[in-house]
Amino acid sequence: MCALRRLLAKAADFIRESDKILLIICIFTSLYGCAAVFSATHYRATYRPFLIQFICFAAGVVAALIISAVDYSKILRYWYLAAALGVIPVMLTFFIGFAPEGTDDKAWLDLGFTTFQPAELLKICFVLTFSAHLSAVKPNINKLKYLIPVCMHGAFPVLLIHFQGDDGTALVFAVMVVFMLWAAGVSKKYFLAMIPVILIAAPILYFFIMNDDQRDRLTAIFGVLNFGAKRDPNEQWPTYQQWRGRTALANGGFAGQGFLNGDFTQNGIVPYGFNDFIFVSIGEEFGFLGCMAVILLLGGICFRCLQVARLSKKDSGKLICVGIFAMIFAQAVINIGMCTSVLPVIGITLPFFSAGGTSLFCLYMGIGLVLNVYLHRNSRTIYLHDNLK
């Protein structure tokens, strides 16, 4: 009887001390995302993408709760295991990588019953390893003998994913590195020193590293390819997706055409309307109001991550929250920028909305880490009732 009382007391404390606000926002966001995936794939007469999304959502919530229960300080002690867990699957893609239909990047592993994108897991593992590294050297972070290894650590996943062929995800890693370095207290002078380096590297990147398709997509944003010119609807060109996307968004108007009623969405006219361009599908069927709901929900998640970072008493906890914030923020901004023709198309999914089981499950792993930081935000260990009679 005492054991049962102790277990119930621990469960009650766990519920009371958990960040219910963040978890509830994430659940509502995922339900909205599942509905959007269902609608965007309805014309294909298959429920597989929706079922995968919903199953990974449910499994992700469970994983987040489990991860949140183990003190993150203990998890960080095994940073080397996190590094291996993140890097080894990515390395395997160089040898047995699988490229799904519609992409040339062999950035997936075929597990037989489903596919798995290791870069998504690497994001979470990198947040752990980089947080452990930064918190360990934080008092001396601005000394070059400590800063250089830190920068090499940050550059590793960026370069690894670049050579894998997924430059969009590499860019997300770069944003995560910058935000986490800033949060760790790296001096502004180092960030300012990077400006001339970026200015010098930009033309080299454009002329010698980018391929023709990437250059066309970038220059099209600035009107070099005459974005608004009349084109053959059946012809594929660098901004074809965005042209279709803008047309579908305009078709949605203020309140949208209604669930399962989008002319473009329900006829599969917008390429990848269930994945990279799901924001467009939402805009057509739910209109400006639906798009604003997406932005507010994702903004709420990002804001809550930063709030938890501020509440944490440990540097490692703050850095974990900032890393997860940066991951979600970067993906959301880039994806919405792609869909609205503000940024070039680089294959970034919209967090919690785009179809993709690996992405959604790993997102919840990241949310689990933020919940963990909130749960263990004080120095005392919670939900211990050893003195219960």
Report residues per predicted region:
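Hydrophobic alpha-helical segments of polytopic membrane proteins
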Residues: 62, 80-87, 145-161, 167-207
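Membrane interface segments of multi-pass transport proteins and intramembrane proteases
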Residues: 69-80, 96, 111-113, 139-143, ...
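Juxtamembrane membrane-interface segments at transmembrane alpha-helix termini
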Residues: 89-101, 182-190, 202-212, 229, ...
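Hydrophobic, glycine- and aromatic-enriched re-entrant/interface helices and adjoining loop segments
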Residues: 102-108, 193-291, 315-316
